[in-house]
A protein has these predicted regions:
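Short beta-strand elements
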Residues: 19-25, 278, 380-383
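P-loop NTPase nucleotide-binding/switch module
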Residues: 168-205, 209, 237-290
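Walker A/P-loop
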Residues: 214-255, 320
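The Walker A (P-loop) glycine that initiates the GxxxxGKT/S ATP-binding motif of P-loop NTPases
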Residues: 217, 280, 302
């Protein structure tokens, strides 16, 4: 027959929708037409496919060739459909058997020599193909990435000739080579940080409840060092989380590595990063730093040095856990459930309240004014990281507990949250907070007075209750007590700083 149907996969956010490649050969003047909303890069595949077939000693049909990429309303980009188009032409012209095509999917860009080149976003295609119950053929260079999904049927090839021989039953294509398991680098330990017991305690609370955390302090007090220790006290990714995180990295051009498969991502963009770099975008939308940090930690150092509009673009993803990028032709949705950790100096000169301040209160307020109130409201804990007292470095320094000891408490608290809430405390909505974070009348009155004194919002009320619930979980308590509220209120360093500046 002069009609062939081949399956492939597009790339749309973290999804890989099926694309049906229909190839029809008809009589008439020789031509090669492509329909189905192909972009320029896809239209260019006509020349690549023709050269690849001729250089592979195949016959290029002297007929009117029509290639339809369905569905027509799905934009197609890149060279990922080259292999499927070439296979369709060969099957329609009866140069290869077509009986096995419907059980397979094909992904890969063709070189003029017939070599199959790697493409981006293979991991989402592997997951989608597994769910569809088909075997996916990918370029050999994409094999190690595809091998991460162990229950998927995947084959790899380096040349078009090998694929055609496999479809004809003359050759067995290899399975993807599994990645060599890398030896994970030693995770930095919290015992490396001298002193700063309150900041370490805040880090433990943040890890247990997945709360957003802001460190405030002069230069050189260990803010960045503390933040880099957070992944070491977090639990590993579940299989589902690991697959979703790796799929995002695959789309972003970051090849997931076997040794880091269940390791939570830790992203540290520079303060000169644009809004597109942070939240994602582009003419062909790609994930930004907040999506690459999905299920992990996003650390923003020197927070006031970021553009205000860049930081404000994080407000919605912090609440919803995803980011929608709208373009004229489509909308793309990327997951962005990350834990935000920020670090900043309390003033332009870096110091405040330690006798080294060179900035006036008005200068400090202007400096802090670079951060909008709604953005600061997204931090559950804001902690002061002061200069170490004299003698801390020369004497016997207080190192505190190891990351492993703290991690065990974090895992226990998370188990308690998941068994009670089915989710972590930072994800509790207002109705769940009323049920799970109930206070006695005396404690409720105490908290309300504290909120009014600090001039905090209703959002801050909810965040304090969530943090108090996490503190109670770490202590193994069933109910929130006044001591937990007092500790949670102690992690409002930014509110106290602003209050002191405005009053004096």
């Amino acid at each position: 027959m002069s009609l062939a149907v081949v399956y492939s996969r597009a790339s749309l956010g973290v999804a890989a929708p099926q694309v049906t490649v229909e190839v029809h050969l008809s009589n008439g003047l020789p031509a090669f037409n492509m329909v189905g909303l192909p972009e320029t890069s896809v239209k260019e595949s006509r020349d690549r496919v023709r050269s690849a077939l001729l250089n592979g000693n195949f016959e290029f049909p002297s007929k009117h060739i029509t290639v339809n990429l369905a569905p027509a309303d799905l934009p197609k980009e890149g060279g990922r459909f080259d292999l499927a188009i070439a296979i369709g032409i060969l099957a329609a012209s009866k140069q290869i058997p077509a009986k096995y095509l419907l059980d397979h999917e094909f992904l890969g860009e063709l070189a003029l020599t017939g070599e199959i080149r790697p493409v981006l976003g293979v991991l989402p295609a592997v997951l989608a193909c597994r769910d569809a119950g088909r075997t996916l053929l990918v370029p050999r260079e994409n094999g190690p990435e595809a091998s991460l999904i162990q229950d998927a049927e995947v084959r790899t090839a380096h040349q078009l000739l090998a694929v055609t021989a496999w479809l004809a039953g003359q050759y067995e294509l290899p399975l993807p080579d599994p990645q060599t398991t890398d030896t994970l680098p030693e995770v930095p330990d919290l015992q490396d940080v001298i002193g700063q017991s309150q900041a370490k305690r805040a880090l433990e609370i943040a890890a247990a409840g997945s709360h957003n955390l802001l460190f405030i302090g002069p230069p050189g007090t260990g803010k960045s060092m503390l933040a880099s220790r957070l992944p070491g006290i977090l639990p590993p990714l579940s299989e589902q989380e690991a697959q979703q995180t790796a799929a995002i990295h695959s789309i972003g051009g970051l090849t997931p590595r076997a040794g880091h498969w269940h390791h939570r991502p830790y992203r540290t963009p520079h303060h000169s990063a644009s809004a597109v770099a942070l939240v994602g975008g582009g003419s062909h939308p790609r994930p930004g730093e907040i999506s690459l940090a999905h299920n992990g930690v996003l650390f923003l150092d020197e927070l006031p040095e970021f553009e205000r509009k860049v930081l404000d673009s994080l407000r919605e993803p912090l609440e919803t856990g995803h980011i929608t990028i709208s373009r004229a032709a489509r909308q793309v949705d990327f997951p962005a459930r990350f834990q935000l950790v920020g670090a900043m100096n309390p003033s332009p000169c870096g110091h405040y309240g330690d006798g080294q301040t060179r900035s006036s209160p008005d200068q400090i307020l202007r400096y802090l004014g670079k951060l909008s109130g709604p953005f600061l409201d997204r931090f559950d804990l804001t902690v002061e990281v002061p200069l170490l007292p004299k003698g801390s470095l020369t004497g016997k320094a207080e190192r505190g507990e190891s990351s492993q000891q703290i991690r065990e408490r974090v895992l226990g608290a998370r188990e308690q949250m998941l068994s009670r809430n089915g989710k972590l405390n930072n994800l509790l909505d207002s109705r769940e907070i009323e049920e799970i974070c109930r206070l006695s009348p005396q404690d409720a009155e105490f908290l309300e007075n504290a909120i009014q004194k600090l001039g905090l919002s209703i959002r801050a009320w909810h965040r304090i209750l969530r943090v108090s619930r996490t503190i109670a979980d770490l202590a193994g308590r069933q109910a929130i007590e006044k001591e937990h509220l007092i500790e949670a209120l102690g992690y409002r360093a930014m509110d106290r700083l602003l209050s002191r500046l405005r009053s004096g």
